[in-house]
A protein has these predicted regions:
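A structural motif detector for short, solvent-exposed N-terminal "entry" segments of globular domains
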Residues: 23-70, 102-105, 123-128, 147-209, ...
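Beta-strand signatures of extracellular beta-sandwich domains
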Residues: 66-68, 111, 204-206, 250-252, ...
C-alpha cells in the first residue's frame, strides 16, 4: 500500500514538472528569424533585425520578455510594449530603439527570458551579408520578416512591396556568357514588374548607397513584363560604371529624387553561375537565363564534403572516408570531380602511395559544392623545405596538350588545386589557375609558373600569411620561380639581392619569397621560390588606393596595366628639358619616388646586373601618385665586375632604352648628384657592407642546401657546379683583389671625376681604408 501511494505521489510530481520542462524546449514566444548583416532590405532601413513568433494560442506582451546576448547574458534588452497575437510575427530592429544591442557578424548566443525563466535560446551562426537564419530552414538567402519562414512566406514578403522596376538576375563572374565588345562583363537583368510602360532613364543603378544616382539607365522604353540587360563593365556610357564582385555585391535601383525602387544582395558566385528572383523567391542558376523567365533554380550551394584524414606525410597504408550531404563524387587521378566521376558508396578509399583525393557533394535542389582536395604523401620525409603541391588533370598540365609542353602559349591556363604542406601539416588548400611564366626562361627545361586566383576557380583573391617580410597577406596572383635563367648556376641571385635591400631600401618595391619543393601531379619538380607578383593588387596594397587606380609598365615601354601616358611624357620631359633648371628638376621630383630611384640604381650597379635595361615601374594614382621601381629579374646580377656605375648609367653601348633617361638626366643636376653620392655612401656602409652581404649569402645557401641535391638530380645539374657558382658570388663580393664596395667607389670617382679629397669627404673611412 505504501509503494502504491509513493508511485501516485511521484506521478503527480512529474505531471507538475512536465509543463516546465516542455516550456524550456517549446515556448509560446520563440525567436524565428534573424539577420546580422542587412545590406539590401530597405523596408527595414538596412537594419539588422530579430523576428519573434507567438506559437501559442493566447496573446503575448513583448514587454514581459528580456532578450540577452552572450553566453553569460552580458547584454540585456527589455523588449518594447507590443501585443503579439497567436500565430503572429513581430519584427524588432537592432537599431538601438527596439533592441539596444547589435548582432555581431561572427554570431552569438541569444537568450529570451520571461521574468527570471529562460523562454527560448538560440545560437546564431556567423552570417555573410544578406544571409538570414530562420528557425525552420537554418541559413539561407531567403528573408521573410513578418511572414512565415516558408517558401510561401518568403514570396509573400517579397510581393508585399511593389517594385516598378526590379532586379531579375545577376551574373558576377562571367566566364563565357554573352560576350560584349570582345569581353565578358558582369551582367544585371532588370524586369518591368509594373502594369505599364516605363522609361528606363527615370531610374539609376548603383553599388554604393552613398552614391544613389551613380549610373543613369539609357533613354529607352520597356514594356510590362519585359527584360533589360545591363553590362556592368565599369566603363560607363551605355554600360554601368561599376563592376560586380564575384565574392558578393549589393545593387540598388533609385529614382532621380532618391526614392529607392529595389535592392538585391548577390551572394558569392562561381564561373557563369547566376542569381535571381522567380515568383518572389531567390534562386541560384548553374547557367544564366538572361532575356527570359528565370524559372525555379537551385535553393543554394551544397556544402563541401569532409575527409577523415588530412593532407600530410604517411608511411603506412591508410583508408580515407568521405562524408557530406547528398551524393559524393570523387577522383584519385588529380582531376576535378564531375557528375560523371565515381560515386562514393561509403567504402573507405584505400591508399598506399602518393595520391590526391578530390571530392564534391551534390544535394537535391542545390548546386554542386566546391571541391575538397586532400593529398596523402609517401616517401617525402627526406625533404626539409615545405612541400607545394599542384594537383590537376594530367592532360591539362603535363600531357601533349598541357601547359608544360605548350609553353609558348602565354594564354593557356589550367585549373588546379594548390596545397602547401609545412612541417608535415597542411597550411592551405586553394583552387586556382596556373600557366607558364617568363620570357626567354620558358624555353628552359625547368619552367616557372604563374598562379592566378580567379572567380571561375573559386575566390578571386587568396589570403594567407605566406611571406615573412611582405607586410600583406592577400594576393591576386603569385609566381613560382624556377631559378629562371639562373637555374643552372647559383639559383637564387634574384632573391639574394632582394633580401639585401628589403630592410634598408623601403622605397624600392621588393617581391618577397618563400622556398619550397614543388610537386606537379605527384612528380617532383625541384626547388622553387614562391614569389609576390607585381599585379594591381600588389601595387594597391603597397602604395594605396584600389586596383582600378594602378599603372604598371614593364621594360621597353610595355604597358601591363592602366595608362602609360604620364610615364612617356615624363621620359620625354627628361630627354628634352634641362634638369639643371630648378623648375624642371622639381617637376621631375614631384613625379617619382626620389629615394626609390636613387636606391634602385645603386643596388643594380652593386649587383653588376648586365640586364639593367629590364626594369618595371608602377604607381597608384590614389596614393602619392609617384612612380616607383620594382626590384625584379636579377638573374644576370653579379656578373659585371668592372665599371658597374658606368655600365648602368649610360656611358657604354646598349643603353638606348628610355629606361636610363630619367636617371642620367637627373645626374646632370648638382643637387641630385650630391644626394646620389650621399645615399651611395650610406648603402655601401650598411646595405652592402661586405660582412653583411657575405652573412646573408650564407643564410641563402643554408636555406636550400639540404634539398639542393634532389633539385640538381631532377634536372641533371651537378652539386659541384652549384657550389662553384656560389663561390663565384662570394668572390664577387670579396676576393684577393679587394671588395665590391671598393670597386663601386672607384667607379664613382671615374664617372663623376672626383678628387681623392672629394671621395674622402663623401665616403670617409671606407675610402681611406680601401675597403
Amino acid at each position: 500500500m505504501r509503494m502504491k501511494k509513493f508511485a501516485w505521489t511521484l506521478l503527480a510530481l512529474l505531471a507538475l514538472c512536465l509543463p516546465a520542462l516542455a516550456g524550456a524546449e517549446e515556448t509560446s514566444l520563440v525567436i524565428s528569424e534573424a539577420m546580422s548583416r542587412n545590406p539590401a532590405i530597405w523596408q527595414l532601413d538596412y537594419q539588422d533585425y530579430i523576428e519573434f513568433y507567438n506559437a501559442g494560442d493566447t496573446a503575448l506582451e513583448l514587454s514581459d520578455y528580456t532578450l540577452c546576448r552572450g553566453d553569460n547574458l552580458e547584454k540585456k534588452c527589455c523588449l518594447p510594449a507590443r501585443t503579439v497575437q497567436p500565430g503572429e510575427y513581430a519584427v524588432l530592429l537592432c537599431d538601438g530603439s527596439e533592441i539596444t544591442f547589435s548582432l555581431p557578424k561572427e554570431g552569438c548566443r541569444l537568450t529570451l527570458l520571461c521574468g527570471e525563466e529562460t523562454a527560448n535560446t538560440l545560437t546564431l551562426p556567423a552570417l555573410q551579408k544578406g544571409e538570414v537564419w530562420t528557425r525552420e530552414n537554418g541559413v539561407s538567402m531567403q528573408p521573410s520578416p513578418g511572414y512565415a519562414n516558408t517558401d510561401e512566406g518568403g514570396a509573400q514578403w517579397y510581393q508585399s512591396t511593389q517594385r516598378a522596376l526590379a532586379f531579375s538576375e545577376a551574373l558576377s563572374c562571367n566566364v563565357s556568357t554573352m560576350r560584349q565588345e570582345y569581353e565578358y562583363y558582369d551582367m544585371l537583368e532588370l524586369c518591368n514588374t509594373s502594369g505599364g510602360k516605363l522609361q528606363l532613364s527615370d531610374f539609376y543603378l548603383t553599388d554604393d548607397l552613398a552614391e544613389p544616382l551613380k549610373w543613369q539607365l539609357p533613354a529607352r522604353e520597356i514594356n510590362p513584363g519585359a527584360y533589360y540587360t545591363v553590362f556592368a563593365s565599369g566603363l560607363g556610357g551605355k554600360q554601368a560604371n561599376f563592376k560586380l564582385s564575384a565574392s558578393g555585391e549589393t545593387v540598388y535601383i533609385f529614382r532621380a529624387d532618391g526614392t529607392i525602387v529595389d535592392a538585391m544582395r548577390i551572394p558569392a558566385l562561381r564561373g557563369d553561375e547566376s542569381y535571381g528572383v522567380w515568383r518572389g523567391l531567390y534562386y541560384y542558376y548553374e547557367k544564366s537565363t538572361f532575356g527570359k523567365d528565370n524559372g525555379a533554380g537551385a535553393r543554394g550551394v551544397s556544402a563541401a564534403p569532409q575527409m577523415s584524414l588530412e593532407t600530410g606525410l604517411y608511411n603506412q597504408p591508410i583508408a580515407v572516408s568521405l562524408s557530406g550531404e547528398g551524393t559524393i563524387y570523387y577522383t584519385t587521378d588529380g582531376s576535378r570531380p564531375t557528375l560523371k566521376s565515381k560515386k562514393y558508396d561509403g567504402t573507405a578509399i584505400a591508399i598506399s602511395d602518393t595520391t590526391a583525393v578530390r571530392a564534391m557533394c551534390v544535394k537535391d535542389d542545390y548546386l554542386a559544392s566546391d571541391v575538397t582536395t586532400r593529398s596523402y604523401l609517401y616517401g617525402m620525409e627526406k625533404y626539409e623545405l615545405p612541400l607545394l603541391l599542384i594537383t590537376g588533370k594530367y592532360d591539362d598540365l603535363l600531357g601533349g596538350n598541357g601547359i608544360y609542353k605548350n609553353y609558348k602559349n602565354r594564354r593557356q591556363e589550367a585549373a588546379i588545386n594548390l596545397t602547401l604542406v609545412d612541417e608535415g601539416q597542411m597550411a592551405f588548400s586553394v583552387d586556382c589557375g596556373v600557366k607558364i611564366h617568363g620570357n626567354s626562361s620558358r624555353e628552359r627545361p625547368k619552367k616557372s609558373f604563374q598562379i592566378r586566383f580567379r572567380s571561375k576557380y573559386g575566390a578571386s583573391t587568396f589570403t594567407y600569411p605566406l611571406f615573412e617580410h611582405a607586410g600583406v597577406d592577400t594576393f591576386h596572383s603569385l609566381i613560382l620561380r624556377s631559378g629562371s635563367e639562373d637555374q643552372n648556376r647559383s639559383f637564387f641571385r634574384d632573391e639574394f639581392l632582394g633580401s639585401l635591400t628589403r630592410e634598408t631600401m623601403p622605397n624600392v618595391l621588393y617581391l618577397d619569397y618563400k622556398p619550397v619543393n614543388l610537386f606537379v601531379d605527384g612528380k617532383y619538380y625541384g626547388i622553387y621560390y614562391i614569389r609576390e607578383r607585381t599585379d594591381t593588387t600588389y601595387v594597391s596594397q603597397h602604395l594605396g588606393g584600389d586596383d582600378e587606380q594602378v599603372d604598371i609598365i614593364n621594360s621597353w615601354q610595355d604597358l601591363e596595366q592602366g595608362s602609360m601616358g604620364d610615364w612617356s611624357r615624363l621620359n620625354t620631359f627628361c630627354l628634352r628639358k634641362d634638369l639643371t633648371d630648378p623648375a624642371n628638376y622639381n617637376e621631375v621630383l614631384s613625379q617619382i619616388s626620389l629615394d626609390g630611384f636613387i636606391d634602385y640604381y645603386i643596388a643594380r650597379a652593386y649587383s653588376g646586373d648586365r640586364d639593367y635595361c629590364n626594369i618595371r615601374v608602377c604607381r597608384s594614382r590614389a596614393g602619392d601618385n609617384r612612380w616607383y621601381i620594382v626590384n625584379f629579374d636579377l638573374d644576370w646580377g653579379f656578373t659585371i665586375a668592372k665599371t658597374p656605375l658606368v655600365s648602368m648609367l649610360g656611358k657604354v653601348s646598349n643603353t638606348s632604352s628610355l629606361n636610363n633617361v630619367i636617371i642620367t638626366g637627373l645626374l646632370k643636376n648638382q643637387d641630385f648628384r650630391a644626394q646620389f653620392l650621399s645615399r651611395m655612401a650610406l648603402h655601401l656602409s650598411t646595405t652592402f657592407d661586405t660582412q653583411r652581404v657575405l652573412s646573408r649569402l650564407d643564410e641563402m645557401v643554408a636555406e636550400v642546401a639540404h634539398d639542393m641535391p634532389y633539385n640538381q638530380d631532377r634536372w641533371g645539374y651537378s652539386m659541384e657546379k652549384w657550389q662553384e657558382y656560389v663561390q663565384l658570388l662570394r668572390d664577387f663580393v670579396q676576393d684577393d683583389q679587394g671588395t665590391r664596395v671598393m670597386e663601386m667607389m672607384q667607379d664613382a670617382q671615374r664617372l663623376f671625376s672626383l678628387s681623392n679629397d672629394e671621395m674622402t669627404a663623401i665616403f670617409g673611412e671606407m675610402w681611406t681604408n680601401g675597403r
